[in-house]
Amino acid sequence: MANQYHNDLLAPYLALDQGGKFHAEYVWIDGDGGLRSKTTTVDQKVTDISQLRVWDFDGSSTNQAPSGNSDVYLRPSAIFKDPFRGGENILVLSETYNNDGTPNRTNHRHHTAKVMELAKDEIPWFGIEQEYTLFDADGSPYGWPKGGFPGPQGPYYCGAGTGKVFARDLIEAHYRACLYAGVNISGINAEVMPSQWEFQVGPCEGISMGDHLWMARYLLIRVAEQWGVKVSFHPKPLQGDWNGAGAHTNYSTLAMREPGGMKYIEAAIEKLAKRHDEHIAVYGEDNEMRLTGRHETGHIGTFSSGVANRGASIRVPRHVANKGYGYLEDRRPASNIDPYRVTGIIIETTILDK
């Protein structure tokens, strides 16, 4: 049974004056690809990341350090407004570092920031379509008949009406929380499988893609916590004739976005084809369960591309092909990706010629 979240009891306390002090909630990626956070009090309004201290936590409790040498450090990397506390309170996305100053093994932002710096003159933009699935606290798909199944896929994608969509109130709350926080969320929609949803983040330039997607995920699981709902980013949470969950990654450089850019898009696709296996290796765990060649996916063992082809590894949208410039969509990434790793390897392959 889920713990009840007492918003009505909490509300009067959130309305109290904070005495000139503010909350800073440090958020980080743990050793298993999940998210953790803890709060510190700051004595002044934070307007720049340099005002925030380097903090630490017990890495032995997050699978990031041994118990005998457990301190892991949090270095602030991006600031967002806090939609849960409001006011001038903030969320602080942080990188993790070992006590010898080296990045923790789960800190993929450190490397990708260097990659993005090398490619900054190309002005790379990304947009990620984050799919996810909602479950009751007992592990049942949210809104599904207990011990049974809803009707087959068909009416749920972008659906409207009772029995076709589930948890729209939660999804709307998350959308508004992202907008308030400053996350560059660009849309939402119900997905093909019932209780599966998608939100889109972007376009974001360079390293900010990973920052904004991770914070959007954090906001989602925090909002879902208030509803007593679990969020799954597993790429194939349910076996059977149900769609998996991906994180389709849209990508372009300035040259691709300008008239005549199709030749640069095609050149990028050729480079991506040559490193298919290297990309698959960082495109999410259990992705072989999703990339089967069915349910709008290409097969994990084969690279393919095409215009408006949702069964391909790389899709070029029809409107992009018609105009002759724009972007490409990499449909291989799973819903549980680390976006820093995905955006980083795309840059390495298409710009840095790794």
UniProtKB/Swiss-Prot annotation:
Enzyme Commission number(s): 6.3.1.2
GS beta-grasp domain: residues covered: 22-101
GS catalytic domain boundaries: 108-354
GO molecular function terms noted in the UniProt entry: ATP binding; glutamine synthetase activity
Tagged with keyword Metal-binding: no
Keywords for the protein's UniProt record, in alphabetical order: ATP-binding, Cytoplasm, Ligase, Nucleotide-binding
Gene3D superfamilies xref list: Glutamine synthetase, N-terminal domain, Glutamine synthetase/guanido kinase, catalytic domain
Catalytically driven reaction(s): L-glutamate + NH4(+) + ATP = L-glutamine + ADP + phosphate + H(+)
GO terms under biological process: glutamine biosynthetic process
One Pfam family hit: Gln-synt_N
Main subcellular localisation: cytoplasm
Superkingdom per UniProt: Eukaryota
GO annotation, cellular component aspect: cytoplasm
Family: Belongs to the glutamine synthetase family.
Protein name stated in the entry: Glutamine synthetase
Native species: Amanita muscaria (Fly agaric)
Gene: GLN1
